Regions:
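Bacterial N-terminal signal peptides that target proteins for export
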Residues: 1-10
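Bacterial Sec-dependent signal peptides at the C-terminal "C-region" and cleavage site
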Residues: 9, 13-26
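Hydrophobic alpha-helical membrane context
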Residues: 19-20, 45, 200, 222
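Conserved SGNH/GDSL esterase-like catalytic core that processes O-acyl groups on lipids
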Residues: 23-125
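Alpha-helical cap/lid subdomain in secreted, periplasmic
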Residues: 78-230
Length: 230
């Protein structure tokens, strides 16, 4: 009886020690546009065995108007930078990885003036500053390219602002150059999403559920490789 109790106690103790020694999963913090908000639930599930996904939180506002960045929608690069500056004041904000995208809101054109929301040089400066402040906190950046725009689909359906694929390509190029400069991994969600076909759009720029799941799986595959390389 006594020996049985001791064996059980020893088993419990060993289990407790093993749990205590288990290294916690790294945290991946996601900031992106409404595209990221749509694939996020799938991504959280797909990487649950290798990382904990956290994200810019929402009060339910982001889904009310996908074209107006509020709540969990990171918005343009200026908004993302300001948000991160605010987060850096919180000493508890220390994810191992920041999974980041901004671009679709940067390239909005005013239909009357044709003025772009964030000019190229400002976009570059904002990304450079994001790299700097996250590096100071030893947060590893993983970049996600901006998804494609089909001018003939987008602009007839969206009268408040226009977007053009030529800007997507140009701004992705700027981001890619910065990624190469600092050795930041970049996930080509642009070409991957384009391969899914024009029929996967539900409106001017957002995707059907099957494509959201595929985007998440594609990103998850890259993240797993990156996490395994550390």
């Amino acid at each position: 009886m006594k020996n049985g109790f001791l064996k059980k106690a020893l088993f419990v103790l060993v289990g407790f020690i093993l749990v205590s020694w288990t290294k916690p999963l790294p945290e991946v913090f996601l900031i992106g546009d409404s595209i990221a908000g749509h694939y996020r639930p799938y991504l959280e599930k797909y990487i649950s065995n290798v990382a904990r996904l956290n994200w810019k939180r929402d009060d339910g506002q982001a889904e009310k108007n996908l074209d107006v960045p509020t709540g969990s929608n990171g918005g343009d690069s200026r908004m993302v930078l300001e948000y991160l500056k605010h987060k850096m004041k919180d000493q508890d904000f220390k994810p191992e990885y920041l999974l980041l995208n901004c671009g679709l809101h940067d390239i909005k054109h005013d239909p009357e003036t044709d003025k772009i929301q964030i000019p190229e040089e400002d976009y570059k400066r904002n990304l450079e500053e994001i790299v700097r402040i996250t590096g100071n906190r030893n947060i590893k950046l993983v970049w996600v390219e901006t998804t494609w725009v089909v001018d003939s689909v987008h602009n007839p359906k969206q009268k408040l602002f226009y977007r053009y694929e030529k800007d997507v390509i140009r701004y992705n190029t700027i981001a890619d150059e910065i990624c190469r400069k600092y050795g930041i991994p970049s996930i080509d969600l642009h070409d991957f999403s384009k391969k899914q076909g024009i029929e996967q759009f539900i409106d001017h720029v957002h995707y059907k559920e099957p494509t959201r799941a595929l985007q998440a799986a594609y990103i998850a595959g890259f993240l797993e490789r990156i996490l395994n390389e550390k």
